[in-house]
Amino acid sequence: MGTPYHLGIDVGGTKVAFRVESGSACIEETSFSWGARHSAEDDLAQLAGHVARLRERIGTPLEAVGVAMPGTVGADGRVATWPSRPEWTGVDLKTALHSLFPEAAVAWADDGDLGALAESRASGCENLLYIGIGTGIGGGLVLGGVPCPGLGRGSFEIGHVIVEMGGVRCVCGRRGCLQALASGPATLRRASLLRGADVTYYRLQRALRNGEPWAADALEGSTRALAAAVTGVQELVHPDRVLIGGGFAAGIPEIVPSVSGFLADLVRQGQAPLPVEPAALGGLSSLRGAVALAGLVAAGEVP
């Protein structure tokens, strides 16, 4: 019998990515974009179709499947909230996944937690804070090589840490969450207000390269908030470094040095600012983490 096949799935608000590994070798990597939003049933049918085609290509049963989820999944296996696709609320994820992969051991976890796990393994750093900036803000904390608070014990929701009392309303219903101030859409909204005209992602990239003041000010509003959140985590658990990734951050290299500068401003006497680096895996952190989760569940390390 050959080396078992493990599948990682990164479920996003706009697309779903898949990676099949055998040992350390990548067998297949593919993705699809969600169709028009109608119902969770339509989404699950689209997912099932892609899985069926993937199975045909690899031609080998799967030993284990790990799934990175952006929404909140309750202990009963049902989706409690997913702001990007609210029609998934109440979906029995556990049953749906076992129907798709009846022969495999299956587990799921927060996409930010899995991103942190993958980055920890890729960098060789056992104590790190990972922040993924995209449509929202996810993140994860790894201490001693283990995700914190722990798989199955809830997610590390740094995107919903409050950094500005009475600030902008977040999709979660509170005000002043990091996500409401520093996510990709939040940064673009601030940039549009400062410029006095709509700003796209590519327009912001170009303006930052050209040193346009409105672009720099828009980004600083986000990186100040990020530095405040990171400082709070540093005071509590003392990670060795911060890695910043996600699709939005991957294309704006100015984020990392800006956060680093504000962290230096916030440091207390006798305390060193945390090193800030770009995520080693870029926008693939959660997908690689999902594959790692499949390996853990296959080894019996995840119930």
From Swiss-Prot:
The keyword Kinase applies. Pathway: Antibiotic biosynthesis; rifamycin B biosynthesis. Inhibited by Zn(2+), Cu(2+), and Fe(2+). Its EC number is 2.7.1.179. It comes from the Bacteria. Keywords: Antibiotic biosynthesis, ATP-binding, Kinase, Nucleotide-binding, Transferase. GO terms for biological process: antibiotic biosynthetic process. It catalyses: kanosamine + ATP = D-kanosamine 6-phosphate + ADP + H(+). GO terms for molecular function: ATP binding; kinase activity; phosphotransferase activity, alcohol group as acceptor. SUPFAM superfamilies: Actin-like ATPase domain. Belongs to the ROK (NagC/XylR) family. Involved in the biosynthesis of 3-amino-5-hydroxybenzoate (AHBA), a compound that then serves as the starter unit for the assembly of a polyketide during the biosynthesis of rifamycin B and other ansamycin antibiotics. Catalyzes only the phosphorylation of kanosamine to yield kanosamine 6-phosphate. This is Kanosamine kinase. It comes from Amycolatopsis mediterranei (strain S699). The gene is rifN.
